[in-house]
Regions:
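Bacterial Sec-dependent N-terminal signal peptides
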Residues: 1-32, 276-278
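Extended soluble regions of mature proteins
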Residues: 28, 33-278
């Protein structure tokens, strides 16, 4: 594990990997350690508006929360399924055939981050790729200062109660149910007296809502991939993401209209101006 300050990311790496399929970080190619096991998963739908200049455009995707005995893990469901397929192909000696089938186009995702909760104990670990490096940072699980409110409602078949917190530059409204005694939820959110069924920021730029709870007949591993992570802080990580975006835009402007790939990068990054945290 390396520790270093985060520098501005060269544009070259982004131009080489401009595709929105962030699954280019192939986690199944790396050694990993098993942290826990789960036989219960919770799928959430996320709807988000990534462009503040076009709030009518709403994107959506499925995310998965794997609930272990001690550790839980949250990530893109497409990313999870694609990584598992790749690892199975690698174990069977069929990795090249797997690449040749180009399965990745069926498992597109905007989210390559992964979040481990209660790893290390009492903290969560957020890890992601900001080209060209892999970064991780940790924060205390108790980072959320929830305000429990009296308002109640129902979502689907679940009676829910309202809660509020401030995090990542946004005001968040959560609806949780004590009928599912799991103090967890989507993204980094946890710590309420029951499962979070729905949570959104007050502008509804990011909305997570429960899709399905599944229990399996067998247990699956919760893994942490050893990718030579650069350990940093949340603040420095967010700064790296912002610097990455600004670097793309400034260099694309300097490149002129003849640099097609840079102009494509410029247009793409202009539309991704509304991160979940800032």
């Amino acid at each position: 594990m390396r520790t270093q300050s985060i520098l501005r990311i060269p544009l070259l790496f982004f131009v080489m990997q401009i595709s929105a399929i962030q699954l280019s970080a192939q986690f199944y190619d790396y050694p990993y350690q098993v942290l826990d096991s789960f036989n219960l998963s919770i799928t959430y739908s996320i709807a988000w508006k990534e462009d503040t200049n076009n709030l009518e455009r709403v994107r959506s995707e499925k995310m998965i929360l794997m609930v272990g005995k001690e550790v839980s893990k949250f990530m893109s469901k497409n990313f999870y399924e694609y990584s598992n397929m790749g690892r199975e192909a690698e174990r069977a000696g069929l990795l090249q055939e797997f690449f040749d089938r180009n399965e990745r186009q069926n498992y597109r995702t905007r989210f390559s981050y992964q979040i481990l909760k209660n790893y290390p104990k009492g903290s969560y670990t957020y890890y992601n790729k900001v080209l060209p490096d892999f970064f991780q940072y940790a924060e205390p699980l108790q980072v959320f200062q929830w305000e429990l409110l009296d308002e109640t409602d129902s979502i689907g078949n679940y009676p829910v109660q309202k809660a509020h917190c401030t995090y990542g530059g946004r005001e968040w409204v959560a609806w949780y149910t004590s009928s599912v005694p799991i103090n967890d939820g989507p993204y980094k959110f946890r710590g309420l007296p029951g499962l979070i069924i729905k949570i959104h920021d007050e502008k509804e730029h990011y909305v997570f809502i429960l899709d399905v709870i599944e229990r399996y007949d067998k247990y699956f591993d919760i893994e942490f991939e050893d990718m030579g992570w650069v350990t940093t802080t949340r603040e420095n990580y967010l700064m790296a993401e912002q610097n990455f975006r600004l670097d793309i835009i400034s260099r694309a402007k300097e490149a002129g209209a003849t640099a097609v790939s840079m102009q494509r990068a410029y247009r793409s990054m202009l539309k991704k101006n509304n991160p979940i945290e800032f």
